[in-house]
A protein has these predicted regions:
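Cytosolic regulatory regions of ion transport systems
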Residues: 1-458
Length: 458
């Protein structure tokens, strides 16, 4: 597949890196020559220096042969024009654009992105994707990550093992014996900034970030097994009333108006606008790092503090101050991957990365054949894959023990109609089974090849 990526920032660079690992033909356009030089030196992709919306530049990048264009520059207008040019002049089949400005995606202008107007097939809003990730963590306290699979029948959950975890220093093979009624598969352990694809002899230690598959009915009990019995927060304070904060407020209010919400916002105009938009919410003007402001927010009675400003350092520091001041749980936004491996050690309960959220969402729409879900976890170090077995697949009637899986791939669960099956070597694969796996980064293309050989976008 030939893919043109417009913009070599954190998101564009990550998408390019992923697609190159999966043996795609990748061309990246950016007007920063030094970034393109770095890209050419570090990965097997072709870099083109120039403005992504320029027809000559797109032509030089091979747009007339491209299967897909992903426009993720820092400017919404450039992303939109790049997709329009790719469609009108080069007939690129699929177009994805990152759009930050919420007015563009307002329901009021819902017909803007259509074949008759701006022919963009998928709009990605990083702020909305981040808000969704945070909201998922709020709905299921104790999680650092939560991915829904097989129409909410199965979940991949990440959680930090507390010192109250009843299975500390226990080999994984002992867990089904100790908890026979909880269907669960541990697929990854993050420890000391390294990830481990575990064997049944590996043990769990306090501070480990555990990633596991379980079904919807047993998710809460599984989290209890790892030391988490928190209830859903009823008192929440959000620091940052920008696009992420506003999207999060809207999600919380639309699902449960009984939750007591407070918002801390330093910018006067933004605080006034929030007060007008959400008159029922207490808006405090000031810094979340100011202990007086935190006292005014009654931080001791706040169950969850969420820092979502555009400054990583402020988010992390404010989260730590909030926790020290008596808040039960803190969630921080961190744009830089340099912080994501440190925050848990510092005491931040969950860290959400806009880059990871955006890349995962985009990769959902760059898939092949019977791959239903493909999401990155742990800053792209591993992937969660849900694949459907077609009726004509060579996998039909094959037992799991006969599957030639790549290294560092773990089968999590199999969904067959309404039944959820734990992986057993003797299980025989049937048509339309959904097989859910975890794979180290770079193995997804091999998994895709197992299920299909046809290219399918969207």
């Amino acid at each position: 597949m030939k893919v043109i990526i417009c913009g070599a920032g954190q998101v564009g660079y990550s998408i390019a890196s992923y697609l190159v690992r999966e043996n795609n033909d990748v061309i990246v356009i950016d007007n920063n020559e030094s970034i393109i030089d770095k890209l050419n030196n570090e990965m097997d992709a072709n870099g083109v220096v120039g403005h992504a919306s320029n027809p000559d530049i797109l032509e030089a990048a091979g747009a007339n042969e491209a299967d897909l264009i992903v426009a993720v520059t820092e400017k919404d207008e450039v992303n939109m024009v790049a997709c329009q040019v790719a469609h009108s002049l080069f007939n690129v089949p699929k177009k994805i654009a990152r759009i930050r400005e919420t007015s563009f995606t307002s329901a009021r202008w819902s017909n803007l992105f259509s074949r008759a107007h701006l022919p963009i097939d998928k709009i990605i809003s990083p702020e909305v994707e981040v808000a969704k990730s945070i909201y998922n963590c709020l709905k299921t306290p104790g999680t650092t990550n939560l991915i829904s699979l097989a129409e909410d029948k199965v979940f991949l959950a990440g959680t930090i093992c507390s010192d109250k975890c009843p299975v500390l220093n226990t080999q994984l093979k002992q867990i089904p014996i100790l908890f026979p009624n909880i269907p669960l598969v541990v697929c990854m352990i993050a420890r000391d900034n390294q990830i481990i694809v575990p064997s049944e002899d590996d043990q769990i230690y306090a501070g480990d970030e555990i990633y596991f598959f379980t079904d919807a009915a047993h998710l809460r009990r599984a989290l209890t097994m790892f030391g988490h019995e928190e209830e859903q927060a009823r008192h929440i304070t959000i620091m940052g009333g920008g696009n992420v904060g506003k999207s999060l407020i809207e999600m919380i209010r639309s699902h449960d108006k009984r939750i007591n919400l407070k918002v801390i916002e330093q910018d006067e105009k933004r605080a006034e606008k929030l007060s007008m938009t959400f008159p029922e919410i207490v808006i405090l003007r000031g810094s979340g790092m100011d202990r007086d402001i935190l006292r005014e927010a009654n931080i001791k009675s706040t169950e969850t503090f969420i820092a979502v400003t555009e400054d990583d350092e402020n988010n992390i520091l404010a989260s730590l101050i909030a926790k020290e001041s008596g808040c039960e749980r803190v969630i921080s936004l961190a744009n830089s991957s340099n912080y994501t491996s440190l925050t848990a050690k510092l005491g931040v309960d969950a860290t959400v990365s806009p880059k990871t959220s955006t890349v995962s969402t985009i990769m959902q729409h760059v898939r092949r054949g019977r791959i239903k879900t493909l999401q990155a976890i742990y800053d792209g170090e591993a992937e969660i894959i849900e694949a459907e077995v077609s009726e004509t697949s060579h996998l039909v009637n094959m037992s799991l023990s006969d599957l030639e899986l790549p290294n560092e791939v773990i089968i999590g669960m199999i969904v067959r109609n309404d039944d959820i099956l734990l992986p057993d070597p003797e299980i025989v694969i049937e048509p339309l089974d959904h097989i859910i796996l975890m794979a180290r980064s770079g193995q997804a293309s091999k998994i895709e090849d197992m299920f299909t050989v046809q290219v399918d976008l969207f």
